Amino acid sequence: MASSKLREPVDEVFDLDLAVPETTRLDSSLHKARAQLLVKGRRHRPSRSRLRDSTSSAEDGEGSDGPGGKVTDGCGSPLHRLRSPLHSGPGSPAGGSFCLEPPGLRRSLDEDEPPPSPLARYRPLHNAASHEGLAATSGSPPRSAPSSDSSPSFVRRYPRAEPHSEDDSRDASPPEPASPTIGLDKKTRRKFLDLGVTLRRASTSKSRKEKGSNRLSMGSRESVEGSGRTGGSPFLPFSWFTDSGKGSASSGSTTSPTCSPKHEGFSPKKSASQESTLSDDSTPPSSSPKIPGDPRQETKCSYPYHTLSQSSDEFLDESLPAVEHWTSQQVGQWLHSLNLEQYAAEFAARQVDGPQLLQLDGSKLKSLGLSNSHDRALVKRKLKELAAAAEKERKAQEKTARQREKLRRREHEAKKS
């Protein structure tokens, strides 16, 4: 009885072994192969001279390789086909792997590597394409495929590229996709880059100058071109941007004020600080109306941004006509510029001048014959613009007067010292 009781637990143990059979260990060879691949990826790229020697030796030994040679493109196990999707593209062969290197060069590079481990079935993972895919996930620097400069076709086709040093291959610029007919050296690339920077700077300065040229009328520009002055206008665009400059200037020429060529000539007395300070406060809206002038006042301009091209002495020595100093004739010309010439006779009969024009409201405009609400709204809007421009002009004159006073004080102190 006792012996039978002792046999039962022993039998139960053997029964458990039968119920749960022994299994083989998990295959961790793929992870080991990946770890070895990452370690190999930290090697530096071979130099051009070494690649050239290995290529020549590979070409010599290409015909002597028999069936006993080293096989690098074999893809034996189905596990590799399942776990490496980088080689299963439709363009690649069924059993081979995709690589950018020629077969002779790849064979010579494999000869420098240590002897293969027992995991020979994972050998096809050691090419450039799968290495880049695996190394990108782990963050280690991948061993990139040799560029077109190091390929044997490039060496045979361009023998002058051999004297380049090894530092050229490690240039900071990214490798360009080379074609068999196009090969740009570093100097040519630098010239193209400098040309791009020059054009970019020219385009920005052109856009700034076009903003100023939009405020000039076509009549004043024609008078500048006809005058034949040696000092050109600072608002003229570049020669290769002439068409766009003319187009933008013609769009804003109907509403911009006129000015004589005297105010558009560049004066060498103008300092850069005065030009920058005047350009901040003296920029009226681009839709400002045309300011008419009688024959005695054609050489004067009412807006202060025309003084950017003249000296501060000329700006203060001349009395610029503002809206408050308009005569009834100038008011009539202003109405003609707004296409409201049918009301010019009534304004001339009432002797409406500049100060009276600024005081007009809706009821006064109705009494002057502007029965159309659209015309009244147009006149009111233009009057607001005139008042704002006059206020800006007054502030600019005050600021320029203060600047001139400061300059005189500095010159006086400099003379004393």
UniProtKB/Swiss-Prot annotation:
<dbReference type="GO" id="GO:0031175">
    <property type="term" value="P:neuron projection development"/>
</dbReference>
<dbReference type="GO" id="GO:0005737">
    <property type="term" value="C:cytoplasm"/>
</dbReference>
<dbReference type="GO" id="GO:0014069">
    <property type="term" value="C:postsynaptic density"/>
</dbReference>
<feature type="compositionally biased region" description="Low complexity">
    <location>
        <begin position="138"/>
        <end position="153"/>
    </location>
</feature>
<feature type="coiled-coil region">
    <location>
        <begin position="375"/>
        <end position="416"/>
    </location>
</feature>
<protein>
    <recommendedName>
        <fullName>Sterile alpha motif domain-containing protein 14</fullName>
    </recommendedName>
</protein>
<dbReference type="GO" id="GO:0015629">
    <property type="term" value="C:actin cytoskeleton"/>
</dbReference>
<dbReference type="Pfam" id="PF07647">
    <property type="entry name" value="SAM_2"/>
</dbReference>
<dbReference type="InterPro" id="IPR013761">
    <property type="entry name" value="SAM/pointed_sf"/>
</dbReference>
<feature type="region of interest" description="Disordered">
    <location>
        <begin position="390"/>
        <end position="417"/>
    </location>
</feature>
<dbReference type="InterPro" id="IPR001660">
    <property type="entry name" value="SAM"/>
</dbReference>
<dbReference type="GO" id="GO:0007015">
    <property type="term" value="P:actin filament organization"/>
</dbReference>
<feature type="modified residue" description="Phosphoserine">
    <location>
        <position position="84"/>
    </location>
</feature>
<feature type="compositionally biased region" description="Low complexity">
    <location>
        <begin position="276"/>
        <end position="289"/>
    </location>
</feature>
<feature type="domain" description="SAM">
    <location>
        <begin position="326"/>
        <end position="389"/>
    </location>
</feature>
<dbReference type="GO" id="GO:0030425">
    <property type="term" value="C:dendrite"/>
</dbReference>
<feature type="modified residue" description="Phosphoserine">
    <location>
        <position position="279"/>
    </location>
</feature>
<feature type="modified residue" description="Phosphoserine">
    <location>
        <position position="108"/>
    </location>
</feature>
<dbReference type="GO" id="GO:0019722">
    <property type="term" value="P:calcium-mediated signaling"/>
</dbReference>
<feature type="modified residue" description="Phosphothreonine">
    <location>
        <position position="283"/>
    </location>
</feature>
<feature type="compositionally biased region" description="Basic and acidic residues">
    <location>
        <begin position="159"/>
        <end position="173"/>
    </location>
</feature>
<dbReference type="InterPro" id="IPR043446">
    <property type="entry name" value="Neurabin-like"/>
</dbReference>
<keyword id="KW-0597">Phosphoprotein</keyword>
<feature type="compositionally biased region" description="Low complexity">
    <location>
        <begin position="244"/>
        <end position="260"/>
    </location>
</feature>
<feature type="modified residue" description="Phosphoserine">
    <location>
        <position position="173"/>
    </location>
</feature>
<dbReference type="GO" id="GO:0051015">
    <property type="term" value="F:actin filament binding"/>
</dbReference>
<keyword id="KW-0175">Coiled coil</keyword>
<feature type="modified residue" description="Phosphoserine">
    <location>
        <position position="179"/>
    </location>
</feature>
<feature type="region of interest" description="Disordered">
    <location>
        <begin position="37"/>
        <end position="306"/>
    </location>
</feature>
<feature type="compositionally biased region" description="Basic residues">
    <location>
        <begin position="40"/>
        <end position="49"/>
    </location>
</feature>
